[in-house]
Amino acid sequence: VRRILPVLIVLLLLPFAAPTRAAAAGTVWHVIRPQESLAYIAGMYDLDPHDLASWNQIPYEAPIQPDGVLRLNPPPAPLPVFSSRIETVSPGMVNWNPAKGCPIIPANLRRVWVTYIDFTGAARDGSVIVRHDVAPRVQRAFETLYRWRFRIMAMAPMRLNMPGETDMSIVTAGYNCRAVAGTKVWSEHAAGTAVDINPLQNPMKRGTFLSPAAGGLYLDRNRRLIGMIHPEGAARAFLWNGFHWGGTWTSLKDYMHFSLTNR
């Protein structure tokens, strides 16, 4: 996380920089807030709304969605059409150890590949592993996030999508054969029925415990920062596909966590 914090600080400040009509270099963007329209945002930055729609490859007349991110300058390359595929996994892919007694076997897991937009605005191919019957729901949710231009910090394979990063707590991911922190109860991740989105920007807080530990910057959920999830924004992509969101819990808050069982 130390390596990425300076980058995050720059990313957080960029939306408040004064962009030109066609910035020649750098990435400048705006995180969409509720009730904002394309024309309203264009007016904020003295831009033509048609240019704004073109740069972000979105229909001019289509409503924009909270938590999405709009470029305020021409992209270096157009975004590709969203694509996704589902693959089987081998025991080695999930570090399978029969002795642990994980609640699901590798044969019932699937790797879901999706196109996503990273924090620099580049399109990448990333994957999450979930239970076989959950995979289509995950595909639909990520397609919606992509269409809304929501950005994801990092997904596997990290050696390609964020080379050199060693802190896996920041990765958007699904299956993980582990217990709920501080208990002996299997996590829904161990069953392949949960996905965590942008953990650093959407931390879990239980009392004074915070995970990831560096997520304190994002505890004020009234802020609108790149990668943050809000109920009227990105959360809906998963809620509409049958998931429950840990951001609505009362005993603790787990803003990254989407599960089918509400656990």
Enumerate the language-model features and the residues they cover.
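Surface-exposed patches in mature extracellular/periplasmic domains of secreted proteins
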Residues: 60, 149-160, 186, 245-251
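Primarily a LysM-type cell-wall glycan-binding module
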Residues: 22-48, 68
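Bacterial N-terminal signal peptides
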Residues: 6-16
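Second-shell loop/turn segments in exported
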Residues: 29, 37-41, 123-132, 183, ...
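Active-site acidic/histidine clusters and adjacent loop/turn architecture
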Residues: 104-167
